[in-house]
Amino acid sequence: MQTVSETFAGTITVNRQMRLALPRMAMSLLIMSYLVADGVLISRFVGTTALSALSMSYPLTALLIAAGFMIAAGGGAVAARALGAQKHEEALRAFSTALTTNVMLGLTLGLLAWFGLDWVFELLGIAPEQTEFARDYQRVLLPATPLFLAAATFEVFYTTAGRPKAGLAASAASGITNVVFDILFMGPLDMGMTGAAWATALSWFIGAACGLWYFMREKSPLKLELHLPDLKLLRTAAGNGLQEFVSNLSYVVAIWLYNRVFISHLGTAGV
């Protein structure tokens, strides 16, 4: 297996750039595809009110994702720069810092949101008829936030390590898990929104487990060694990823505003 340095050695041609970029693009499209499938299946098995509850509560999930991607993207940039300077140990520290920080961040924010769900739902403007659906979904999903942020960190570092195809395979496994268990839990087992949340949580677990297995192997191009976060690298990573956070935050605010306008003028059916 090539090392990371060997992967990026030599002249970087357009073809080489595309070989690295296309799997990452396909990964993003795949993630969006199974999110759409998730919504379709919820509408089919649970109903349109449940789907609107998912849409109304989504800004909460998206905000947690935005915070995690800031660290993941920033950490990936720090690691890539270190690899370019032949500082392999610094790249490994950046990887460990991004992963451990995101797991701790996901655990902290997820639990805070879990205990403050009623206040969050009021802020988001969730209607009374949507509340039970949203609560069933978020009570399962929020404690699993560390799994998603770990999987998101691994997605970034597959590309940093020069192995975007491995990331695409992990995303495919995660997406297939989500759809299969959506059908099983909401169909034959009739678990409603709780089933949809468990299917999503299981898909996050698969994504995190794939990344952990891949990067903990001895032959991994960027072998993960878990340590406490390096605060200096963490500050740099957060600074590098700030643009990613602001971009995602604007998306969260836009969704929240659209939802508030739609529900005030069209009711739950319009969300």
Please give the residue ranges for each predicted region.
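Helix-terminus/linker motif at the lipid-water interface of multi-pass membrane proteins
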Residues: S33-S52, F121-P128, L184-M191, F245, ...
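Residue-level signature of transmembrane alpha-helical cores of multipass secondary-active transporters
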Residues: L20, R24-S28, A62, N102, ...
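Hydrophobic transmembrane alpha-helices of multi-pass small-molecule transporters
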Residues: L63-A66, G110, N178-I183, G207-L212
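Small-residue-rich hydrophobic transmembrane alpha-helices
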Residues: L51-L111, F148-G167, N259, I263, ...
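Transmembrane alpha-helix boundary and packing residues in multipass membrane permease domains
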Residues: R24, S28, G39-V40, A77, ...
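Short alpha-helical transmembrane segments in multi-pass integral membrane proteins
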Residues: M1-A21, A79-P146, P188-L242
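Small-residue hotspots at the loop-to-helix junctions and early N-terminal turns
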Residues: V46-P59, A134, Q138, A197, ...
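Alpha-helical transmembrane segments of multi-pass membrane transporters/permeases
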Residues: E89, N102, Y158-I183, T194-A201
